[in-house]
Amino acid sequence: MAEHAGRRCCLGWDFSTQQVKVVAVDAELNVFYEDSVHFDRDLLEFGTQGGVHVHEDGLTVTSPVLMWVQALDIILEKMKASGFDFSQVLALSGAGQQHGSVYWKAGASQVLASLSPDLLLHEQLQACFSISDCPVWMDSSTTAQCRQLEATVGGAQALSCLTGSRAYERISLVSSFAASLFLGSHSPIDYSDGSGMNLLRIQDKVWSQACLGACAPHLEEKLGLPVPSCSVVGAISSYFVQRYGFPPGCKVVAFTGDNPASLAGMRLEEGDIAVSLGTSDTLFLWLQEPTPTLEGHIFCNPVDPQHYMALLCFKNGSLMREKIRDELASSSWSEFSKALQSTEMGNSGNLGFYFDVMEITPEIIGRHRFSAENHEVSAFPWDVEIRALIEGQFMAKKIHAEGLGYRVMPKTKILATGGASHNRDILQVLADVFGTPVYVTDTANSACVGSAYRAFHGLAAGTDVPFSEVVKLAPNPRLAAAPTPGASQVYEALLQRYAMLEQRILTQTRGPPE
């Protein structure tokens, strides 16, 4: 097809929980091709639900590794059939669902290096994996091992680490496994995804001997040395050159995790924060100096090796907002917005905590309402309740972000995504609580697009070009809300009260802190 011909580009891949996706991005940073394979729908023979198998114990959750390989075959064949011009691909990179692991058999590297272009990948790699069903991020079958690791290294964050005596040649994350397919050899783990394993010392970017020793013997040689996330890990395998027409000089840039790739796709810069307002709410933070705590996850930054990124997840997100909307605003977002418009910033000192499911950050359940005098009350007027919910959700986000070392800077901007980002009144509260402007951007396929951006950055990284320079042509986000004058004074005192009351609830439910 003509529209796919003659455009020099980079490819971005995303090996996510439910599908494999690809985008092609040209030198002007326009997405001009995208495709996907959905595991449940397009690969019925694997019998997955939501891309996974949940085992009888209810704790073990796995995905068939050959399903991921076959999905890649299908997409590449579809691209070929559509007339996609692979000869124009300068580089590629990708993302993988975080915390999944792939176990290569001894001898797999020889198979990867000598693939026949006459056969599909999944036809040749069937005997290459020690474990055919890979544990993924939803797996919680290793709780005992996590506790043991914590005890061994004196309170390290939990790690799902399988041990055993099988002949593993190499252990990959989903990201480095996918890169290995394109490379024709074992790809190293990148710093950013590697820092989600609780085995990497994030300050000096080397494996922690204490954590490795707590998990399994000879683990370091199975993992290989980690590399910077913008590294070119090699040229594409001759298999792809011969079967699809990739140029021999096409570079493979280290693959990373889906969350770090999304940070790249949203083009966060130093001091920025992204808020994904979905079923659960997730914060992406760009940090200079992290303050590791028992909350959240801190990773090496995928686009700046000197800095860090953090993730904070809040379970009571859109479902909680929708529940209050249905209870108090006649299931109408416009009525919900009227409540926010008719109540004042700071809600006359009334504060609320709304956790219908056990929250992660912090570990609280239930609804708790407090008057301006910090007395717990049983109910608020309907409009006060709605503002208390939204203000409380955003104050919690700011407090816990600051707990990880985040500080609002003069040039800070918030990027809002997800369903609630379409409601300007909710975004106004977000701007007021944080005291910084809120922007919205189209982040469909952000991990995929971020991977293509990272491929361009990998091509330029040898010259120390900053990521922001590489992606300056990408579409700019749109301003959605600016802080109301006087907002910072209103919320400065409220934030202190909110943190104090949160601690009071925690103490009441689980006793005083040790």
Where are these regions (language model features)?
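Active-site core segments that coordinate phosphate-bearing ligands/cofactors
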Residues: 2-5, 11-12, 21-27, 86, ...
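Short beta-strand-loop/turn "lid" adjacent to the catalytic site in phosphate-handling enzymes
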Residues: 59, 79-135, 162-166, 179-201, ...
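Conserved beta-strand scaffold positions in the cores of enzyme catalytic domains, especially
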Residues: 36, 134-135, 226, 252, ...
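N-terminal glycine/serine-rich phosphate-binding loop of ATP-dependent small-molecule kinases
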Residues: 1-123, 241-251, 431-438, 465-470, ...
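A conserved helix-loop-beta module that forms one wall/lid of the active-site cleft
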Residues: 216-228
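Generic hydrophobic, aliphatic-rich segments that mediate packing or membrane embedding
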Residues: 68, 88, 97-100, 130-133, ...
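A generic structural motif
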Residues: 37-39, 137, 298
